A protein has these predicted regions:
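Short beta-strand elements in bilobed, periplasmic/extracellular small-molecule ligand-binding domains
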Residues: 31-44, 137-145
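N-terminal beta1-alpha1 ligand-phosphate binding loop
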Residues: 1-31
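Helix-loop-strand module that forms the ligand-binding subsite of alpha/beta enzymes
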Residues: 53-133
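A general structural signal for well-ordered alpha-helical segments in protein cores
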Residues: 3, 16, 20, 58, ...
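N-terminal beta-loop-helix "entrance" segment that forms/cooperates
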Residues: 38-55, 150-154
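Glycine-rich phosphate/pyrophosphate-binding loop and the adjoining helix
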Residues: 4, 136-184
Length: 184
């Protein structure tokens, strides 16, 4: 099973990207987690360019989503919402409507921020957007508050409860993929 992991952050030292690295370590046998960090190269959405094929970076992104069995998102919170670069990529992936690569795709959403609430509003907003796009949003939820305190200098998570929360979120997504395959 192939899961595409997308961080909503552009920062090199992103807590959300670090969470996805830890998630990859928690992956059970037979589950491959590929972290995509290409938000920076996706051009601003332009309906005039809303074609198939679209811009090269957009087509590469669409293909990654299309080839994955599921998508796992980890997002920071900016002004009580998701980062613009992430929303931009989602707009490209869901358009044109007839070729929406997220339709019926199982997805999971977690969030992390330096604040006490851990990006909970951004997580809720991302779930809403993904649902409106036709993705199959799982019940997996994890909001990591005070994220800057959760990692060692090497980016390792020592908090066993947090590691378990990541593992649980991943298992929820894996189960969703397996249930979808069994129903087909």
């Amino acid at each position: 099973m192939r899961i595409l992991a997308i961080s909503g952050s552009l920062r090199d030292a992103s807590y959300n990207t670090a969470l996805l690295r830890a998630l990859r370590e928690e992956a059970p046998e037979g589950v491959e987690v590929d972290i995509w960090q290409g938000l920076k190269v996706i051009p601003p959405y332009d309906q005039d360019e809303d074609l198939v094929p679209g811009p090269e970076a957009v087509e590469a992104f669409r293909e990654l989503v299309r080839e994955s069995d599921a998508v796992f998102f980890s997002t920071p919170e900016y002004n009580s919402s998701i980062p613009g670069a992430l929303k931009n990529a989602l707009d490209w992936g869901s358009r044109p409507v007839a070729t929406n690569v997220f339709r019926n795709k199982p997805v999971a959403v977690i969030s992390a921020s330096a604040g006490a609430f851990g990006g909970v509003w951004a997580g809720a907003e991302l779930r809403k957007v993904l649902g409106a796009m036709g993705a199959r949003v799982t019940e997996a939820e994890l909001a990591v508050g005070h994220a800057h305190e959760k990692f060692t200098e090497d980016g390792v998570i020592e908090d066993l409860d947090l590691r378990q929360g990541l593992s649980d979120a991943l298992q929820t997504l894996v189960t969703s993929v397996l249930d979808r395959a069994a129903a087909a």
